[in-house]
Amino acid sequence: MRIEFTIPVNPRPKKNSPMILWRKQDFKIKIGARILATIPFTPFIVPSKGFSDFENEIMPFLKRLKDEAGVIDYPCNIQAVYYRSTKHTIDLTNLNEALHDAMVKSGLIIDDNRDIIAAHDGSRVFYDKFNPRIEIIITELKDYIQWNDTTTEQIKLL
């Protein structure tokens, strides 16, 4: 099986400038069993606004693709060619992670572990100032051995 599609968004990495927020809940600083201090707020990390905006832009495309192609629960190669609107230094690994996390959140793929996303062969980053986009080709890998039976795992999730 081969699925090809283009998403007309400017790709954003997930790990750029995450925000640290505080939740109103006791946070204990410990060494062993001994509590050194108690702070009335607990820190937690959320993705940057840029990534949240990217995820909101990409989600309708991924959900529509899931409705058309179904859920991917088999080993596949996800080739993603990213066209960015700027020439800023960018990490391909972080772009892939952002895309894969969005694919899981949309329900298009059941997980982004090695049993499902077995390869990223052919992924690249290019510059296109006037037409930023992500061109994606998902190809099923027939000769790949999964460590876990993902179809059984998927049934458990439903």
Model-assigned labels for residue ranges:
Residues M1-L158:
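Acidic, proline/glycine-enriched N-terminal capping motif
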